[in-house]
């Protein structure tokens, strides 16, 4: 067996406790990594990988200076590693043999307080998911802000939350690893915990102990049994990662599914609400984020993820935006104050976790000093919501004053550097500093006094390691030495003496530096303890400042982009005049106007708008802008339209674009059908449905059949969900003749001899041409291909002129409705039996569509 060195024996013992983490092992002035950890660290950090002898074995080694930890740690964490930081727990100078070491912190992607790891505009959520038999639970904690949220629902709802909150790390029970991956994919940094962590008795115990309560009823989450399991798992994980200072986590909040608009993961992706991980496209958030503080940016992301359904709350936000637009002077004053606010939410969390440094405390004070003005402006506003917000704001004037009198304005980052405590705060500290800083002048003064008293002109003060400070007198003057001097040493030409005053000064000055450091540490610790009493107040301020910042941002957005206030109501209709796409209009070349469009939808007369028109004509933009206008209105923003009267929408569904899901073994068409099925299974009477090019992933007749069936299903469904249905199947225009609430519209095109001009205007009536070859020409297709395509198109049109496709579809629909079971045909008889044997109560819409498609093939 290989013999280990004492150091490697200690390393291996510690590493065995953290097998899943990359261990940074402090050795002198370096953090070292060994073995596989060294290989990973060298690759990720681009540092040198070497080998060293560890007893009789050789091992890989890679390291970096300890003072560079804040440079290298973020790179490891962002690469997805859990990093255990092992420090020296003793002073090597005072220890014989091996220094005691231990892990002082375990930093993971979801549990980080380092500013270089965190993004100021985004939360850093640690999430946990439990897949129960009846429901699923989820919890989200941002340890850097103290926000703790729980939710419970089906897998689709949990999936939606994961897409919106984008956790940096996800905790899952080991036995649910496979099931989780099947439902939610493998795009998350997952860590797998033992199953017992997700037990009810443990979760209840750890949560009530943390919040110091007898139950969770006061938080309104006691009935969310599955969600409570995940919240308990998160607190367990924090304990395991050496995060014990958690007094800033003061509450646990329920994400009330019924209070917010349903946005499934497809809708979030299709509407491009957030910037993609791979594509550099401009997102809605990029365009609408006019916030000035980190709290505002994070709040806006939350609002976008959770649009409101309560009419009164939506109107309250609109009222505040309206007030600011009518009182620009107040808006500018508030914005100026907001722009000078630091991240008080994360700073106060650092107080709780004892991670805050003196300079950050000064930043906290500087931010808090703007609160009284904001409070005053809100209280004087005469706007009910702003007045209430101002009333809830805490001035924290005592806190600001205490920080100001305790800390120097230019306090260092590291308390050990000294001069953090302000002059005049502590008389003892000032005296010690005086001794330390004015030692030479004191000795010069002492020398002058003693020389005058004794009449000895050539006195000299010096010191050595034997008896410290002394006065040296040449032999020619030793007869003048006073009686109170004590002789300590005789030299050839001189004698050395000490005095009472000199020994007293020596005692003071020798201990001054050490005492200064200890006293500054002690006074700083007292200040942090004082600030800790204000954690709740500062957290409340952070929440309110985030909300206020969002509303100021909405006002700025409306001014800059000509947005108008939507009129919200309890009805069902959507009426938009001159609506615009908020993102596309910002991407147009300077001077190019955006072509605005009107959209009207209701449940009585115009439930489904069938939009036809060529590719590139703007069909998809009209669909998306309608949803985005509704979404913006329900988060409290004004909208890019001349006017908008909007009934509350509770769900927004989109089936837009085409993409394969190769990793899950699904084709474009299968992805399309899955998304369509999700929509049809979840529509409500307040849903807004956007369908773009349904059926294009399969053959023409299959596609038309499925698109027709879906449109008919939506029309006949009791919910009468409002729908925008964009298609290049012009045959679907026939539906308006048979279904009273389906109306045809087209995106107008001006056709010339050799080309087409896309007018991008939505007009009544269907379109009979797709102009696909014109689009191919605009894309730069070779002339040969264009000419060949035109010839083929002409031949195909001639061959189909006898019975146009639209007529075939129309007649087929009539036949299916009127005489399907009247014909004495064995095939139809068999189909009839198949139909009657189907259990429509258990059949999903997609299965129904597939069955319908199969029957049509058998007929043809």
Where are these regions (language model features)?
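Charged catalytic and DNA/RNA-contacting regions of genome-maintenance
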Residues: 1-323, 336-339, 343-352, 356-448, ...
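ATPase nucleotide-binding head domains, primarily ABC-like/P-loop NTPase cores
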Residues: 2, 19, 35-36, 224, ...
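Amphipathic alpha-helical
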Residues: 85-102, 544-552, 559, 726
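Active-site phosphate-binding and catalytic loops of NTP-dependent enzymes
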Residues: 109-118, 245, 382-385, 444-456, ...
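Amphipathic heptad-repeat alpha-helical coiled-coil/stalk segments that mediate oligomerization
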Residues: 198-206, 262, 273-275, 366-445, ...
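Extended, charged coiled-coil "arm/hinge" scaffolds of SMC/Rad50-like chromosome-maintenance ATPases
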Residues: 408, 491, 495-529
